[in-house]
């Protein structure tokens, strides 16, 4: 099987029928749909079960787990996946009807690329709003890792990364006791140290940002998961390929969220040279507290 289309969900039963109908329209059929229910209290299980009685037949595999956050659901789904490629499809988003076919064709072309440097770990395409407007400013058609995408080619906004399943098994999200959020960029940056992506200039993912979602409350979410936030920014200060100004911003954000630590929060160190970022980090933290109080 080529694809695992993976949907993490938490109390989004009302959105799943639309997502199912969109998947039924895919022109490429060599995929399974893996749904990991992150401890929902609504009727998600019954909704998913109703799909199995309908005509559109592709494998639907449903798993329920204790609530731990999206990143833990991804780890769970990766372990259950049967597909060679792993595509994360959030419950409020959708794929254009030819999306999987485009990705499959691009993936076939990977075999003809010369083997030099890092291995290719997946495919990366454009995200767009439902009106067709591309999100951010992607400007590359070729091969690059996630760090090069942002800091050499100047790509902004979300992209749709479709990784080899074995790559995500090699680089799981850290699961920190008491925290329910981990930035995807932490793992994408780790993957970039070993693997590149085949980028192609096609819209393969349509995204909505729902009110009350993770994106809408990202500062508060990061404050509630300070260890994962610190880990992300601390590692960014040490990554080759990230320019000094970006590493300085990362150091400022490290201190910004370190000040949210609880006694039980694991310690995440940062180099002594970044003590200079403490004061601006403190000011940002105080502003966060004032704004969110």
Ranges and model annotations:
Residues 65-81:
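Glycine-rich, basic loop-to-helix element that forms the pyrophosphate-binding segment
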Residues 98-136:
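Conserved donor NDP-sugar-binding/catalytic core segment of glycosyltransferases
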Residues 129-217:
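Conserved nucleotide-sugar donor-binding catalytic segment
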Residues 186, 201-293:
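C-terminal subregions of glycosyltransferases and related glycan-biosynthesis enzymes
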């Amino acid at each position: 099987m080529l694809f695992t289309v993976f949907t993490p969900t938490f109390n989004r039963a009302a959105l799943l029928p639309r997502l199912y109908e969109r998947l039924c329209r895919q022109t490429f059929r060599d995929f399974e749909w893996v749904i990991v229910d992150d401890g929902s209290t609504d009727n998600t299980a019954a909704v998913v079960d109703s799909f199995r009685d309908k005509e559109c037949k592709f494998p639907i595999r449903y798993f329920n787990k204790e609530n731990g956050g999206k990143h833990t659901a991804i780890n769970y789904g990766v372990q259950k996946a049967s597909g060679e490629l792993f595509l994360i499809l959030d419950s409020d988003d959708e794929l254009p009807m030819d999306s999987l076919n485009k990705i499959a064709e691009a993936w076939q072309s990977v075999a003809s690329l010369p083997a030099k440097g890092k291995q290719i770990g997946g495919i990366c395409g454009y995200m767009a709003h439902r009106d067709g407007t591309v999100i951010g400013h992607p400007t590359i058609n070729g091969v690059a890792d996630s760090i090069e995408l942002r800091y050499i080619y100047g790509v902004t906004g979300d992209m749709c990364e479709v990784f080899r399943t074995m790559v995500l098994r090699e680089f799981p999200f850290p699961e920190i006791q008491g925290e329910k959020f981990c930035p995807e960029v932490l793992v994408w940056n780790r993957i970039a140290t070993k693997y590149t992506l085949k980028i192609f200039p096609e819209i393969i993912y349509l995204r909505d940002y729902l009110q009350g979602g993770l994106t809408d409350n990202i500062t508060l979410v990061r404050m509630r998961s300070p260890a994962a936030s610190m880990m992300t920014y601390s590692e960014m200060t040490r990554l080759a390929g990230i320019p000094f100004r970006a590493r300085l911003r990362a150091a400022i954000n490290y201190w910004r969220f370190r000040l949210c630590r609880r006694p039980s929060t694991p310690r995440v160190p940062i180099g002594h040279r970044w003590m200079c970022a403490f004061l601006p980090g403190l000011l940002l933290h105080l502003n966060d507290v004032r704004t969110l109080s």
